[in-house]
Amino acid sequence: EVIMPAYTFVSTADAFVLRGAKAVFVDIRPDTMNIDEKLIEHAITDKTKAIVPVHYAGVSCEMDKILAIAEKYHLLVIEDAAQGVMASYKGRALGTMGDFGCYSFHETKNYSMGEGGALLIRDEKNVENAEIVREKGTNRSKFFRGQIDKYTWVEAGSSYLPSELNAAYLYAQLEQAEEINKKRLSVWNRYWDGLGKLADEGKIVR
């Protein structure tokens, strides 16, 4: 069983359900639209393996409390930071606090390569397995590093490699990430300030 918020894109659940796990949905906080950390412990059973906090719209979950719960029950924390590139929680980048962090570079994101994403891994022992899954189930990454004289199929995997053209397109954006973020924040502030009067009149909620 994997605990996640009831409000998230279907990919969050798909990643686990397609591999035989059960998604356990927990309600969200109305102020952040993120998982309500106060409800997580009630959802934990002897089958629970991980908590998946989703940082909706780049707004951080209450990670200190979630990490404390995970430590108490010996659970993995897999951050869905698909919308959280360049966002932070108490000075720490979203996606870097759990055991794994997931970024998305889908075309709707602030930094895009059309599709694809990035997996951040805390424990080095998990890197090799991630490389195998990424490389169609082979140890090809080791071959490219000269660690083996030939590569072979070792377990089930798929193809998660972007084209060099798409990677270059993304890399150029990441080089300018601070400037891109600054411009987007300027646009956001313009909307926030401009809609303030309507909010004060009770015509909208912001």
Residue ranges and their predicted role:
Residues Y7, A21, I28, A82-Q83, ...:
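Histidine-centered beta-alpha loop that forms part of the nucleotide-sugar donor binding/catalytic region
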Residues E1-A81, S88:
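PLP-dependent aminotransferase-like
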Residues T45, L94-G95, Y111, S159-P162:
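Alpha-helix termination/capping residues and helix-transition junctions
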Residues E79-M113, K142-F144, D149-V154, V205:
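Conserved active-site segment immediately N-terminal to the catalytic lysine
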Residues Y103-S104, G117-D123, Y171:
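Short beta-strand-to-turn element immediately C-terminal to the catalytic PLP-Schiff-base lysine
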Residues K38, H42, A50-V54, V59-K65, ...:
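PLP-dependent aminotransferase class I/II
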